[in-house]
Amino acid sequence: ELSRGLGDVYKRQYLNKIDVLKNHINRGDVYEANFCFEWFSEHAKINPLYVYKNLNKISKSPMSVYFKNKKLHLICSSPERYLKRNNNKLISQPIKGTSRRDIDFVIDKKLKDNLSLDPKERSENIMIVDLVRNDMSRFSKPGSVKVKELCEVYPFKQVHQMISTIESKVDSSLKISKIIEGSFPMGSMTGAPKVKAMKIIDELEETKRGLYSGAVGFIDPYGNFDFNVVIRSLIYDSESKHLSFHVGSAITAKSKGVNEYDECLLKGKAMILSLT
C-alpha cells in the first residue's frame, strides 16, 4: 500500500506548501520552481523487471530504462531527454506542460490543442527554455545555441507533453564533465533562477529526491552520449522492500494548487497501475 500523497490530509499539506512557494514567486525570489513529493511503501514485494515491463506497456516512453545496482532497481518510463551529444552537436529537450489523453479522438485532439495554446503552460516551458539556453551557452560555440522547436505538443500513451528542443555546437575537444557540470541538474526539474529555486524546494520538499530528477544514459567510446531525465520512475530496494516514486510540477505565479495536485496524480497514474 502506497502512502503519502493520497488522501485529504496530505493534499492540504501540499496546498499549504504551494502557497509558501507562490509567496516566494510573488516576492521575486524565483520565477518558477519544480515542486515534488513522494509516494512510498515500506513493505513492498515486487518483481522489478516484471513491473518495468508492465509499466512500459501502460506508458511506453522513448527514454525508458531499467537499471539495477546491487539491491537498488530503477524502473523508469521517462519521456524526457536531458542531453544528447552526437559528434559536435548537443540536443536538450525539456518538458513543461502536461494534459491527459482521451480515448475519444475529438476530445483527445481538443485536449492537445488546449495544451498547445495554454498561456500558463507555454510560459512555464519558455522560462525553462531560456534557462537551458543559458546553461548551454556556457560551453557551446558562440552563437550556436538555437531553439529548434518551441512548445511543441507530443502525444504519449497516457498524456500529452509540451516539449521544446534546443541545439548547439561544441568543440570536439570539450570534455563530457564540463558539459554535465555546466548544465546539471536540468532546469526542468529545478526552476529559474536555478540555484535559488533549488534552495527553496530543498526547504519545502519533505524527502530527498535521490536518483529521481537525476539522469541515466550511456557514453560511447567516441564521447557521444544520451541521458534521460529520471521522472515517471519507481525506485525499489529489494533488501529493505522500500518502494517509492516522486511526482511534481512546475509552479509559477499563475499556478493553482488544486490543479497542480491533480497534475501530479495524473503523472503518478501509470506507476500505480503498473503495480496492480
Language model region names:
Residues 84-157, 238-276:
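Cytosolic ligand/metal-binding cores
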Residues 162-276:
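Conserved hydrophobic core element of enzyme catalytic domains
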Residues 1-10:
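Single conserved hydrophobic/aromatic residue that forms the stacking wall/gate
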Residues 68-71, 78-79, 84-89, 140-142, ...:
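Short acidic-glycine loop/turn motifs at beta-strand connectors
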Residues 11-24:
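Phosphate-interacting basic helix/loop segments used at nucleotide- and nucleic-acid interfaces
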Residues 31-91:
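SIR2/sirtuin-family catalytic core signature
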